[in-house]
Amino acid sequence: MSTDTGVSLPSYEEDQGSKLIRKAKEAPFVPVGIAGFAAIVAYGLYKLKSRGNTKMSIHLIHMRVAAQGFVVGAMTVGMGYSMYREFWAKPKP
């Protein structure tokens, strides 16, 4: 009885750096969304000291909503870009 399933694996393994670069080229708005999320959270934490008389919970909720809105916007633009690439920019055979 043979245990060979007929699946062949590539003879090389892709390191994490090249895999990240390849994935960023396939979906360019994912790194943009992650970077925007990190920037908004960093800015919100920086402005935490000068929030005035706003409650901490309200400030954190506003920061979370802004970060999530940026990520959803980046996902929407990325989806539109990939649809454009696939349906309109693709040459007709």
Swiss-Prot record:
Localisation per UniProt entry: Mitochondrion membrane; Mitochondrion inner membrane
Alphabetized UniProt keyword annotations: Acetylation, Electron transport, Membrane, Mitochondrion, Mitochondrion inner membrane, Phosphoprotein, Respiratory chain, Stress response, Transmembrane, Transmembrane helix, Transport
Modified residues (Phosphoserine): 8
Induction: By hypoxia.
Principal subcellular localisation of the protein: mitochondrion
Post-translational modification N-acetylserine, affected residues: 2
Residue stretches spanning the membrane: 26-46, 60-80
Membrane topology: Multi-pass membrane protein
One GO location term (cellular component): protein-containing complex
Residue span, HIG1 domain: 1-93
Function of the molecule: Proposed subunit of cytochrome c oxidase (COX, complex IV), which is the terminal component of the mitochondrial respiratory chain that catalyzes the reduction of oxygen to water. May play a role in the assembly of respiratory supercomplexes.
Protein's name in the database: HIG1 domain family member 1A, mitochondrial
Source organism per UniProt: Homo sapiens
